[in-house]
Every structure is written in structure tokens, then in C-alpha cells.
Amino acid sequence: MGAIIENETSYTSAFQRDELRIKKILVYVENNYGTNITLEELANSSNISPSTCLRLFNTVLGTTPIKYLLTFRLQKAMEELKRANGRTISEIAQSCGFSDASYFNRCFRKEYGKTPSEYMASI
């Protein structure tokens, strides 16, 4: 019986450690999403290897780090489009980490079913 409890405790502490590592990476994304972020940088932000980073994202969040980053950037872009204040779509795309406005348009349309221009016209 003691071995079962010990294994459960070990599993729980490993899961908590993994969650803490993911949280560190998510904070890094939130603070740096407007820059060019690599998988290696995400992993380094939590002192883990890129392969461990991939595994943790799949296990804990059910997605890849790059897909998470893309979704996060698109959500931030949507927020910024709501309060554009005269800024162009290209400027908003750049501020959210998209170096190519046409790539931003394609990603936005794929995620939300309309282009950033169509979205802005609808709000």
C-alpha cells in the first residue's frame, strides 16, 4: 500500500513540476509575443530541452508550443483590432509578432473565418 501512495505522490509532484514549467513558458509568451520566438527560447525560459517542451505542451495543454503561440498572437491581434486607433492592420500584425502581413491575414482568416479587414468592418 505504501508503494502505491509513494507512486501517486511522485506522479503528483511530477505533474506539478510540469505545470510550473508550462506556466513559466506561458509567462514568457505573454511578455514576448511581439518578438520572433523560437522553440529553443520557449524551452530555455523554463530550463528544459526543446523536446521536453514539445512533450509538456502536448501532455498538459494538448497542443504544440508553436500552435499555442500562433493562437495567442491572433487573440492579441483581435484585441488590438478592436481598438485600432488609426493603426494599420500591418502595424497591428507587426506588434503581435507577425513579420508578414499576408501571413497574418491568412492565419486570421483560417482561425476566425474572416480577414482582419472584414473583422474590423464588423465591429
Residue locations for each model-derived region?
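An amphipathic alpha-helical interaction segment
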Residues: M1-S13, R17-V27
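Glycine-centered tight turns that cap/initiate beta-strands
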Residues: Y11, T35-N36
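Basic/polar phosphate-binding segments, predominantly the helix-turn-helix DNA-binding elements
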Residues: Y28-E30, N36-Q75, A93-E118
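Short amphipathic helical patch at the helix-1/turn junction of helix-turn-helix
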Residues: Y33-G34, K82-N85
